[in-house]
Amino acid sequence: MVREKITVSTRTLQWKCVESRTDSKRLYYGRFILSPLRKGQADTIGIAMRRALLAEIEGTRITRVKFAKASHEYSTIAGIQESVHEIFMNLKEIVLRSNLYGTCDASISIKGPGHVTAKDIILPPHVEIVDSTQHIAWLTEPIDLCIGLKIERNRGYFIKTHPNFEDGSYPIDAVFMPVRNANHSIHSYGNEKQEILFLEIWTNGSLTPKEALHEASRNLIDLFIPFLHMEEENLHLEDADHTISLSPFTVYDKVAKLRKNKKKRSLESIFIDQLEFPPKIYNCLKKSNIFTLLDLLNNSQEDLIKIEHFRLEDVKQILGILGKHFALDLPKKKF
């Protein structure tokens, strides 16, 4: 455990970790302070940060299970101590760490008798087990246990609402949130005119509290960046009728203006999440640090095809959207 003496800056606003410990492989704790803040600012930041920590950070979980010998979810199999449902519940608790975008497959293939744990899961190279000792099942006889798994990276949680079977696989509830809990408290000083924000974070081990704080902060910044590039548009308020009329202005109308201006800063104000890209393309671009239209135009077709998980069809789809809405194209190669 690491614990530091708390000192408060009187000039520059700064974060500091004042306590850090690992209670277990699946429970990390961190305590942070932010100071100095004016009265009222700590609560504003604390509420937003807690929300971002619990709801905006992505995690990786098992979402579907294919059990070859199971006739239904509540069946039992000779030679396995647990029921199929109990195995599903154990798989639900497995904590994974990855930079995965989208979904991937994993599996378990083992012969009994013996103890089946998380270390027996055969994973793709970009996915790791946080706690390899997590229990899955006990095999009491020399039988073969073969299970197919679907792994997904997402945020929030997925609750199965009905048995949506796909190729004999079963959906399981998945809690993607790597932050198990987050609390904030406020302490006043300086004649009650200044505040210190204390933020406590507990994670499941797939991220450290410091990593979670960094990602939550980045997600909040991403939400507010568009306001830095706002331009005055045709906005008319009719007080008498209590109505608001807005011009039918879209991101594509904005690009029409950009073609006339040809300004680099203007291109930076169009973010890729404003375009019509499918989630897979958007996630891959974001992973490659392509956030704006300008970032995208600085790449060639050859650059895009080198992006992990990108296919030629994805590049063609990007070219189609650029051509249709912006009358823009990407060179095949960089000169």
From Swiss-Prot:
Enzyme Commission (EC) number: 2.7.7.6
Keyword Transcription assigned: yes
Assigned keywords, A-Z: DNA-directed RNA polymerase, Nucleotidyltransferase, Plastid, Transcription, Transferase
GO biological process terms, semicolon-separated: DNA-templated transcription
Keyword Transcription part of the UniProt annotation: yes
Compartment annotation: Plastid
Region (Alpha N-terminal domain (alpha-NTD)): 1-231
Gene Ontology MF terms in the entry: DNA binding; DNA-directed RNA polymerase activity; protein dimerization activity
SMART domains in the record: RPOLD
Region (Alpha C-terminal domain (alpha-CTD)): 264-335
Catalytic activity from the UniProt record: RNA(n) + a ribonucleoside 5'-triphosphate = RNA(n+1) + diphosphate
Class of this enzyme: transferase
Any GO CC annotation of this UniProt entry: DNA-directed RNA polymerase complex
Description of its domains: The N-terminal domain is essential for RNAP assembly and basal transcription, whereas the C-terminal domain is involved in interaction with transcriptional regulators and with upstream promoter elements.
Subunit record text: In plastids the minimal PEP RNA polymerase catalytic core is composed of four subunits: alpha, beta, beta', and beta''. When a (nuclear-encoded) sigma factor is associated with the core the holoenzyme is formed, which can initiate transcription.
The family this protein is said to belong to: Belongs to the RNA polymerase alpha chain family.
Role, per record: DNA-dependent RNA polymerase catalyzes the transcription of DNA into RNA using the four ribonucleoside triphosphates as substrates.
Name of the protein in its database record: DNA-directed RNA polymerase subunit alpha
Originating species: Cuscuta exaltata
Higher taxonomy: Eukaryota, Viridiplantae, Streptophyta, Embryophyta, Tracheophyta
